[in-house]
Amino acid sequence: MNLNKSNKFVVIDVETTGNRPQDGDRIIEIGLAVVWNGEVTKTASSFVSCDQEIPPFVSRLTGITKDDLIDAPSFSELAPRILDDLDGACLVAHHIDFDLQFLNNELERAGYESFQGNVLDTVEMARMLYPTLDGYRLASLAEQFNLVHDQPHRAGSDAEVTAHLLLLMKKKLYALPFVTLQQLEACTTDTFSGMQLCIYEAMKTVRTSHHKNDSSYAIYRDFALKKPQANNRTQAKVSIPFHAEHFFGKDGALSSISPSFEHRNGQVDMAENVHACFEDGKHLIVEAATGTGKTLAYLYPAVYKSRENEAPVVIATETVALQQQIKDRDVPLLEKGLGLPIEAAVLKGRSHYLCLQKFAHFLEQIRGARQASYDEQLSVAQLLIWLTETETGDVEELNLPNGGYALWEELKSDPESCTHSNCTFFSRCYYPRARDNARQADLIITNHALLLTDHFQETSTLPSYEHLVVDEAHHLEEAAGRHLGASMSYQHFMRLYNQFGVQENAGLFANISVVIDRHPTAVSADWPNERKQELQSLHYEWNQLFNALQTAIVKKDKRTRQKSEGYLPEDVVDTNVFDAWKRVEAGGKDVIRAWRSITRTLKKEALTPAEETLLQKVNTLCNDLEEAQSILASLLTSVENEVYWAESDANKRPDRLRLYRRPINISEQLSGKFFSNTKSIILTSATLTVKGSFQYTIDQLGLTDTQPKCLQLSSPFQYEKQAQLLVPEDFPEIRQDGEERFTEAVAQFLRSLTSSVNGRILVLCTSHQMVKAVSRMMKPHMQRLNYSLFAQGVNGDNRSKLVKQFRNQERSILMGTTTFWEGIDLPGEDVRALIIVRLPFAPPDDPVYMAKAKQIEASGGSAFSRLALPRAVLRFKQGFGRLIRTKRDRGLIFVLDKRIIQARYGKVFLRSLPTLPSVFAPSKELLARADEFFHDGKRP
């Protein structure tokens, strides 16, 4: 294959009756686009007659019906023209395996030979060349690159879009620096399609050019890196005035630079309170309802305090999405309002950052004895291209294949293997650069995990600071519990075991053997075999231990839905478990001792830089194994105020077992090591109060004796005009009428509601079983309703992808649980109706909840009123907040749980919501009301 500009590509796309040509599925439409001399010179498409029925789901997806095929030509009639176009061409498709198997099946049926020429997969090509995209579906790529795609899932349109995508990607490939192309060519030997040949042709072209594309990059030790931005920190930082009313006012700084900016009293109030607490050294809790503009309300006084003290203020969030919003949207807006630059740095834990030294060593390995898997080769290609684009080296920018995250464990930065200034890559290392940026910043944006690590482990990753804002503070207790707890699984041990490379003579064994051969007098020739036997023995004992744990902890009844099983270490550690653990403990120590010994021995020899890196990797792996054994020991040892539980898969397999421990109450730890050690902390979220009181939050976070200032800000939205809360009085109750009848009622109500809403509906459930059951009942009716259904766990688990698919369909239903109750922003027509299926009480078998409840009851309190109810109310408020996101939104909230009206505690939920019309009536009346609401001419 020759990929210069005179080359010929033929892009083919097929629509079919199914996915398996070997089982009789056939092509019903074929599209073709010819690319020649860097241009799309021909497009064509045709229906294809076949003797198979078109399944309803195919018709829904493509719009193709059996009537379209009545006068269509057979494939044998089309074949001569297709083969003529393919003559001498490279065949291209988006998911080449799918299209090629159907094309070859039809060619052979028509009496022709299958296609034997070069092929190219644009999915594989896109994954390599654009490693940071959220997804690689053709429609997503077309949207990303502004390619016209009028008819998705139609062969002609798909083929033409794929052709233009090919040209775009070819242009990017040929613009890559020569050193990157060299590295890519060496590490893509097992790609599915012709990517290595593409890269080779690009290398030949780029090699003959004068500049080799390299001048735009920082070329360092065979890596092409994005040039770091120039450091303009030559001038002293300018102090800023603080005047919230002026800054956020109707004629203030923000309104002058943003026409859409709206003055909000709550925003001014919050900014002034944050400023006052920073000045006075006090803690503040702020519940800022949706629409108050809380982010800017704390960023403005935070920058003021940073400039005044010449020290950074830390902003900690739970989610990556909010960190990116602050960095990319809110800080730039604040800069415009202030008229001066603000230095904001994102800092995460060390394991988020790539270690260039480790990556260079890995590339040496796969050019030598190590056989890289397909996922590893794809990931390496992604990383090489990403290095030309990234400023941060943060893994969260990447969209790696599944196997790529195992590779990341080998390549991430860690303190054990880091040689700091002795490392040849130190001046280019991402982690020290991130820390340096943080030290110079006005604002340090980080996550709850790193924040808590700094406080409880005293790692000092973050620079010294006195003022802190914790956004998404309703997650802080859970994050602290996770941090102070621990977990260990069989799979974690297997990942460590596989890094040694015992089975495939790869990994550490392959590399250490090479080093031993170079230094035969230092180490016995029998050393590798002895170590393999030790590791195989440890692997066997680990299996025995988890089999014993599974027997001791997990219930044998596979029909049970219970995901978690609580346990007490003293009850579990019977003779079998205890003996197995002691053998694992001893075996692990033997392995660690032997491998550390060889590193000490070899360090006395004259080593190459690659060998030194290998020994660092050995030490890191030994440390990881030692830590894993220590964690497992803690999970088998009882500690007061700790809860222990195990989770497994539906089949209760020992190799899927994971053990957990968590503090029951973390209020004392937070009070003693978190709030006491920081001068002023601002806690903020949209959901911190229950029935107007902050007491639950204060108790959970250990602030009872601190007496923080509390501020509750209502939303500027007019809920009484924008929304209604509707509860059907004739709905069955799950406890009285059974889960099956309740689920059927949910599905029936949802089907009836679609005609009234005529738009997007978000359905929030409290269990995955409910999502799957309702989805199953809805599926046969979706074509008749002209609706699309996207259900968590049915159509995938990736929340962002499901939300994107939901938004792309005007008539669609999105069903989810847990993570869908918060953190998704669906303004305007993105969602017109919200259904809360049940009040979101925690599952009664949740181990942490059970332990907390038991502790409360033992002290004479009510677990329901002090724990279950407040938790449920806060989650309910989070779900409620998904509907109205702007002043222009309108929508309906349906609660299908009559307890909100009938139970004595129902009023606690209602009083925690903003004032809005609430109606408790028969389902038919509510559906009629919905029809009137959406068709009364008052749509936004």
Predicted regions mapped to residue ranges:
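A substrate-engagement module of RecA-like helicase motors
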Residues: 224-230, 241-252, 310-312, 316-442, ...
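Acidic two-metal-ion nuclease catalytic site recognized across multiple nuclease folds
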Residues: 2-4, 168-241, 245-246
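Conserved pre-motif I regulatory segment
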Residues: 238-285
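A contiguous, basic/glycine-rich beta-loop/short-helix subdomain that forms a polymer-engagement track
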Residues: 409-442, 452, 457-459, 588-731, ...
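Signature of the SF2 helicase/ATPase Hel1-core->accessory helical subdomain module
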Residues: 324, 415-443, 447-586, 688-700
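Conserved non-catalytic scaffold segment of RNase H-like nuclease domains
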Residues: 2-118, 131-153
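Walker A/P-loop
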Residues: 279-301
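Conserved RecA-like P-loop NTPase helicase motor core
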Residues: 717, 728-741, 793-900
